[in-house]
């Protein structure tokens, strides 16, 4: 894909998806809010300074590629890294696997609904903030 003509936000989204990151997982790796990643991808703001360098490290590309899409700085194909789970994630997985399958399905459905509600809430808060900032 030709990335030179993409915006900074489009390059961030393109590379994030190539590496199979969600906005939340990228934000977690950068120790920032997922709203910041969303704003970058929409073009509402741009990463600067330390965030730009951290972003280039997580996205396995150069900062100049993020900013300008330079062909000679094209990112290399994604490298599959083994996933290391935190103690909390391991505990969650062990508890989940101890449940009967029907209860696993119920718990997954409930968690999906909670995440959906939180995402909706964050979007509403972001819209309210944008309306306030426009005044």
UniProtKB/Swiss-Prot annotation:
Keywords: Cell cycle, Cell division, DNA-binding, Repressor, Transcription, Transcription regulation. The keyword Translocase does not apply. Residues 12-66 form the HTH cro/C1-type domain. PROSITE patterns: HTH_CROC1. InterPro entries: Cro/C1-type_HTH, Lambda_DNA-bd_dom_sf. CDD domains: HTH_XRE (cd00093). GO terms for molecular function: DNA binding. GO terms for biological process: cell division; DNA-templated transcription. Pfam families: HTH_3. The keyword Acetylation does not apply. Residues 23-42 bind DNA. Disulfide bonds: none annotated. This protein is a repressor of division inhibition gene dicB. This is HTH-type transcriptional regulator DicA. It comes from Escherichia coli (strain K12).
């Amino acid at each position: 894909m030709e990335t030179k003509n993409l915006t900074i936000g489009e390059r961030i989204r393109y590379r994030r998806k190539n590496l199979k990151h969600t906005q939340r997982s990228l934000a977690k790796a950068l120790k920032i809010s997922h709203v910041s990643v969303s704003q970058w991808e929409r073009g509402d703001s741009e990463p600067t300074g330390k965030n730009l360098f951290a972003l280039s490290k997580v996205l396995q590309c150069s900062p100049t590629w993020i900013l300008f899409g330079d062909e000679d700085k094209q990112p290399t194909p994604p490298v599959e890294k083994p996933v290391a789970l935190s103690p909390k994630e391991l505990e969650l997985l062990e508890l989940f696997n101890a449940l009967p399958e029907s209860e696993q399905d119920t718990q997954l459905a409930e968690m999906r609904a909670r995440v959906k509600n939180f995402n909706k809430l964050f979007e509403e808060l972001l819209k309210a903030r944008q309306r306030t900032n426009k005044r």
